[in-house]
Amino acid sequence: MVAVYEALWQRGIYPSDVFGYQGLMELVCRDGTSIPKGSTIYCTDAPCIIGKKVLFGPRPTIITGDHRIDILGKYITDVTVEEKFVDGVNVYDQPVVIEDGVWCGANVTILKGVTIGRVSVVAAGAVVTKSFPPYSIIGGIPAKLIKMRFTEEEIKKNENDLSLSAHSI
């Protein structure tokens, strides 16, 4: 376990006594991203992929799974992995993808099956239950699109500038 913690510290991931890490080997965190103390990340039977230069405020929660609650005669804790499959697809465990350059405010919750498009902003306290395109500003419970960060013309310029800066490194 010490080796896991050392590897995390070197990547800018700071686990503390409240860092949930079930299935931590399913966590992918790209360069320039740090995960703050007090984070809760549960990778069930699906990965959590966090892109480059993602910024988190305090206490984010990311959960790639859910519980099946519709089986009669069973406690939720007794549901098997096989019972999470519907027509051959696990609909209760789905990846979370946070693309490059996203900023998540304090106390954000991101749930299974969500992709947050690159360079988006997630307002503090948001509960994200569906995917959003790049350059979105989202917030609320459940999170909704507030507006786009830039106009189409500004997005093209920004993409070009980001591409140029990536090549100059």
Where are these regions (language model features)?
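Flexible, glycine/small-residue-enriched loop-and-beta-strand segment within the central core
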Residues: 17-29, 35-112, 141, 149-150
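Acidic/histidine-enriched, glycine/proline-rich intrinsically disordered or flexible terminal extensions
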Residues: 155-169
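Hydrophobic transmembrane signal anchors and adjacent membrane-proximal interface regions, especially
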Residues: 3, 99-102, 122, 166
